Regions:
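Structural motif
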Residues: 221, 274-275
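A short, acidic, amphipathic alpha-helical segment used as a generic capping/interface helix at domain edges
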Residues: 85-87, 125-135, 257-269, 273, ...
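A mid-sequence, solvent-exposed acidic-amphipathic segment
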Residues: 227-273
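C-terminal functional extensions of proteins
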Residues: 279, 283-329
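Residues at the starts of beta-strands that form the adenosine-phosphate
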Residues: 221, 244, 297
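Electropositive, gly/pro-rich neighborhoods at or near active sites that engage anionic ligands
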Residues: 30-32, 37-238
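Residues at the C-termini of beta-strands that transition into short coil/loop
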Residues: 148, 249-251, 302
Length: 329
């Protein structure tokens, strides 16, 4: 592709992004309009709920715009863009190279900062130190995954883009930049958020992503390490292609308080051929790290089956699933 063709390609991509921005603004307008209709008789609700939410959405769109545009143009050297491998590459590394995965999202970062975004895991200084250790570790068998929030957001739904923009403030970006290595290649934390966030629900893409995900545990002896109410695979057939499926049950909240017991149980009941699927909140990343140190393969999957249940239901919005904890993590 010559230079002129590259310029035309960039302009076409930018034009598409402009249209998506217009769609987002239109959705924002409709949200505000509907809120005004619903709240027209309540000045208190308008002042306390609607206007702050509106300001958050507008600020998020404005603050994030330069990153989304710059991502199309050359990864502007003045802006921070961590290198993140694709969903497909991340899964291929798990399947073909036997690599493990520790995921870092807003909750893990907040604990590292010394704050808390979750009700099911209180801040713990030792957990904060361990998460930072894992985030900055350099073990070829453990992939460190972060959320693909830093630049182009065109693959996400309008609601997801608004949430990302509200979170990715300049302050948040500066904190991430101090913690992340610009020379390191990270992986896609959203491999377990493969349905609800994405704007391609009406295509074959979700089914393809699901098919790739299921290859991770195909014919594997799986040990799920989960909170007592998580119930991975209960009420669905997500893990039916596993050779076997056993569980180690951890506390449903503040699992790190029992971390040593959880790790001991994994080492006692697991074998080197087992695949550990971890769903114990921010402790999952630490456990993945420690299991890799002991030559096990472990994947932090979060509430992966909640996405599967939404997919089966053809859900367009997040809804509670009977029998599962109603947390959207």
């Amino acid at each position: 592709m010559n230079e002129l063709e590259q310029i035309i390609s960039i302009m076409e991509q930018f034009q598409k992004e402009q249209q998506q921005m217009k769609n987002d603004i239109n959705n924002l307008y409709n949200t505000v309009k509907n809120s005004l209709i619903m709240q027209k008789n309540s000045t208190t609700d308008m002042n306390e709920r609607v206007l702050p939410a509106l300001k958050l959405m507008i600020d998020g769109l404005g603050n994030n715009l330069k990153y989304e545009i710059a991502d199309y143009i050359t990864h502007n050297n003045h802006l921070f863009f961590p290198k993140i491998e694709s969903h497909k590459t991340t899964i291929n590394n798990i399947i073909n190279e036997g690599k493990s995965l520790a995921r870092f999202g807003d909750g893990e970062f907040s604990i590292i900062y010394g704050t808390n975004r979750w009700s099911f895991q209180q801040y713990d200084e030792q957990l904060s130190e361990r998460l930072l250790q894992v985030l900055q570790s350099d073990n070829d068998k453990l992939m460190i995954a972060i959320a693909d929030n830093y630049g182009d957001l065109s693959k996400y739904t309008s609601e997801s883009k608004s949430e990302i923009r509200a979170y990715m403030t300049d302050e948040t970006r500066k904190k991430h930049e101090t913690l992340l290595n610009k020379n390191k290649t990270y992986h896609d934390a959203y491999i377990t958020r493969w349905y609800m966030m994405m704007n391609d629900k009406k295509t074959e893409a979700p089914a393809n992503r699901l098919s790739n995900l299921k290859k991770i545990w195909n014919n594997k002896n799986v040990i799920a390490v989960e909170g007592e109410f998580t119930r991975l695979g209960v009420g669905n057939n997500l893990f039916d292609n596993a050779a076997s499926f056993k569980r180690i049950i951890a506390p449903g909240t503040n699992s790190f308080r029992k971390y040593d017991d959880i790790l001991d149980a994994c080492l006692k009941y697991g074998s080197k051929n087992d695949l550990f699927l971890l769903a114990i909140g921010p402790s999952s990343g630490v456990l993945a790290y420690d299991l890799v140190q002991n030559d096990y393969q472990a994947i932090d999957v979060g509430h992966i089956d909640l996405e599967y249940m939404w997919y089966l239901a053809g859900a367009e919005n997040r809804t509670s699933i009977p029998g599962s904890i109603p947390k959207f993590v």
